[in-house]
Each structure stands twice: as structure tokens, then as C-alpha cells.
């Protein structure tokens, strides 16, 4: 399933290559003029039905939030910093994959019985344990500057139309855009832009829009809905049954 493959791929902002390859394989037979620009966006063109058609850019970003390795401790643990908006509260105990080799690791913190003040542990005080016992061993497995992604899997929730997984922001958008291209052409010329580095400042989309200069653009993006945890939280904005 395409969404499963997209969701489980790791593409932290600045290194979206794994996601880009999945997208390329899915659209290459349905478009022309596939390009990867200098920042890493994958763009493609699909000629519409007719002449002198409007040029519509459909955009979805390939990247996800994550981390970067910033150093190695003497005991083999990794120091790291966030890429994109990561909430410190969710980190302790999370499984991650580190670097090009996708070395498995766990984000660790001071055991709860030693953390008497019960405050949220800041990211600077957390470490990633990759099973190394020395700085040299850790450096042999993972280099400074390598990306760290969440180790999660995709699954359908039984008996529902729902699914769980990571990076639905914005792999769902990528999946929808791929589906659009696979079912074209349409009475417009489509410029598909699978963009990079959205989570760190909309960088790829800015480059794509300036370079491609479409007549109009539609961005396929995810956001929160009000069905969880309280469907009555905002009764004037019922997004429960609909895309937002």
C-alpha cells in the first residue's frame, strides 16, 4: 500500500531522498519533465486535455520532523537536537532510527525514581542509546550531523476507515497528489511539486513557487481535527466527517 510505504519511510527535513525515490517510482509513468531542483524538490508536469490551459501547481511536502546527531558521549550515547517542531514531553522512551544505516536506538532519560522534581526533561538532557559502550564505537556507527527519525509503523485500525502511523503530515498529501497524477490527465496543466524542508520554514515550497510560476497553486496539507478528544470542543467547526 502506497501510504504505508510513504509513512514508514524516513525523510527528516534536509534528507528526503528515501521519500523522493518512492514518489518518483509511483509517478514516472504518468508525467513528463521530472526534475529534482537544487534544494531537493521533485517536480513534474502533466499535460492537460486541451490547449492554452491554466497551469495549476499541486504541492505536498515530503519531509517530516525529527532530529540531528550533534555529538557522542564518552559512554557511547548520542547527543541530538530537534529538526522542526518537536515536543520534549513525548520523547523519553521513544524508539528511533539513526543515520543512513537506520541504526535502532531509544531516547533515554534519568529514571523516574531519580527525577524527583517531575519536570519535563529538556532535550539537551536526553540522549539516544544505540547500544554502543564507548565514544569510538558510537562514532563508528553514526556520524555527527546524521538525521534521526521516529521508528514507527503503519497499520489500519480494525473495523474503521482510520489508520495510525507517523508522518501523515504530509505523506497523506503526497499520497493524494500521486493518486491525482495516476488518474489524469485533466482540463488543466498540472505542475506537481513534492517539496522539501517544510517543517523548518517552507523552504522547498518557496523555491518551487518562484521557479515554476504557476497560474495558481493548491497545497495538500494535513492539520488537526476536532473529533479527538472532544467532538464538542468547537461545535461551529465540525471537521469530524470531513477533510480539513
What are the residue ranges of the model-derived segments?
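N-terminal hydrophobic/helix-forming segments and targeting peptides
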Residues: 1-244
Amino acid at each position: 500500500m502506497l501510504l504505508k510505504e510513504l509513512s514508514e519511510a524516513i525523510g527528516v527535513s534536509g534528507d528526503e531522498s528515501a521519500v523522493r525515490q518512492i514518489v518518483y517510482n509511483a509517478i514516472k509513468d504518468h508525467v513528463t519533465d521530472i526534475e529534482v531542483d537544487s534544494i531537493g524538490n521533485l517536480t513534474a508536469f502533466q499535460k492537460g486535455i486541451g490547449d492554452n490551459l491554466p497551469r495549476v501547481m499541486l504541492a505536498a511536502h515530503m519531509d517530516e520532523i525529527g532530529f540531528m546527531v550533534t555529538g557522542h558521549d564518552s559512554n557511547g550515547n548520542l547527543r541530538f537536537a530537534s529538526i522542526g517542531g518537536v515536543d520534549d514531553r513525548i520523547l523519553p522512551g521513544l524508539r528511533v532510527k539513526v543515520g543512513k544505516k537506520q541504526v535502532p536506538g531509544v531516547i533515554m532519560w534519568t529514571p523516574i525514581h531519580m527525577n524527583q522534581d517531575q519536570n519535563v526533561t529538556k532535550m539537551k538532557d536526553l540522549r539516544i542509546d544505540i547500544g554502543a559502550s564507548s565514544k569510538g564505537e558510537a562514532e563508528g556507527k553514526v556520524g555527527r550531523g546524521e538525521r534521526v527519525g521516529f521508528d514507527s509503523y503503519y497499520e489500519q485500525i480494525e473495523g474503521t476507515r482510520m489508520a495510525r502511523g507517523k508522518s501523515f503530515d504530509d505523506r497523506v498529501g503526497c499520497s493524494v497528489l500521486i493518486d491525482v497524477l495516476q488518474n489524469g490527465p485533466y482540463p488543466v496543466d498540472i505542475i506537481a511539486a513534492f517539496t522539501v524542508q517544510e517543517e523548518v520554514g517552507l523552504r522547498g515550497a518557496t523555491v518551487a513557487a518562484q521557479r515554476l510560476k504557476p497560474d495558481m497553486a493548491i497545497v495538500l496539507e494535513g492539520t488537526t481535527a476536532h473529533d479527538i478528544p472532544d467532538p464538542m470542543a468547537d461545535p461551529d467547526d465540525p471537521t469530524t466527517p470531513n477533510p480539513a
